[in-house]
Amino acid sequence: MADDYNWFIEQVKERTGIDLNLYKETQMKRRLIALREKRNYQDFRSYFTAMTNDDTLQNEFLERMTINVSEFFRNRKRWDVLDETIIPQLLKEKKRLKVWSAACSTGEEPYTLAMILQKHLPLKDVSILATDIDRAILQQAKVGYYTERSLKEIPVELKEGFFTKDRAGYYVSNELKQAVTFKQHNLLADRFERDCDLIVCRNVLIYFTEEAKRELYHKFSEALRPGGVLFVGSTEQIFEASKYGLETNETFFYRKV
């Protein structure tokens, strides 16, 4: 069984460039076994062979492998710190901001960023790049259609100003859409941005091995300009941030030295 799974992850890496060894094995293996059994394959070899001949199966695998749990203003108090403290600090240094929402899932995070940033400066003076490994999820983010539940933390004035309701949910405004550029990107394999003022990567690194986390912290640090800030999730505190050329600014916010 172990050899079967190890063979599978090697084949996936060769075919897609995605290294499943960098994810926590217990969680990833459980997720993939459930998907394989759902499609009635007895082992990973037969499942991989089927995937190579069926794009639908491969896309389903990629979607299942990624973590697509998101909502607007998730962990609201942290976003308040970004709004009230971090962004004013960044704007003391420059008047145009380059922002990267890494592993953006269905788009709630970059649209949250746009709603906050427009309070401080015209959106034409902001570059927001939003990336994810999952093409289907990015397409969903570009459409910008959301359920009532995912909007529950949005302040009323922002909800009324930037969303249009229909019978089943809400469409995000064109103003916010135009402020965000979506792009496919693999955190574990692709080249990172440079000279970012703010990088947001939240509730993603918990799924990676410690080795992968260390590599990503180094790469995020290199992607920031001096004085730029990395904003991580509420379970992702960086211990020994100085190893990565970072210092704690506020809780879960790290400034590049």
Curated annotation (Swiss-Prot):
InterPro entries listed in its UniProt record: Bact_Chemotaxis_MeTrfase, CheR_C, CheR_MeTrfase, CheR_N, CheR_N_sf, SAM-dependent_MTases_sf
Entry-linked PANTHER family: CHEMOTAXIS PROTEIN METHYLTRANSFERASE
Database matches in SUPFAM superfamilies: Chemotaxis receptor methyltransferase CheR, N-terminal domain, S-adenosyl-L-methionine-dependent methyltransferases
Pfam families in the cross-refs: CheR, CheR_N
Ranges where the CheR-type methyltransferase domain occurs: 1-257
Protein name: Chemotaxis protein methyltransferase
Protein EC: 2.1.1.80
SMART domains assigned to the protein according to its UniProt record, in alphabetical order: MeTrc
Segments traversing the membrane: none
Source superkingdom: Bacteria
Listed GO MF terms: protein-glutamate O-methyltransferase activity
CDD domains registered for this protein in UniProt: AdoMet_MTases
Positions bound to S-adenosyl-L-methionine: N68, S70, R74, E109, D132, N186, L187, R202, N203
Gene: cheR
Enzyme class: transferase
Gene3D superfamilies: Chemotaxis receptor methyltransferase CheR, N-terminal domain, Vaccinia Virus protein VP39
A biological-process GO annotation: methylation
Described purpose of this protein according to its UniProt entry: Methylation of the membrane-bound methyl-accepting chemotaxis proteins (MCP) to form gamma-glutamyl methyl ester residues in MCP.
Species whose genome carries this gene: Halalkalibacterium halodurans (strain ATCC BAA-125 / DSM 18197 / FERM 7344 / JCM 9153 / C-125) (Bacillus halodurans)
UniProt keyword list: Methyltransferase, S-adenosyl-L-methionine, Transferase
Catalytic reaction equation(s): L-glutamyl-[protein] + S-adenosyl-L-methionine = [protein]-L-glutamate 5-O-methyl ester + S-adenosyl-L-homocysteine
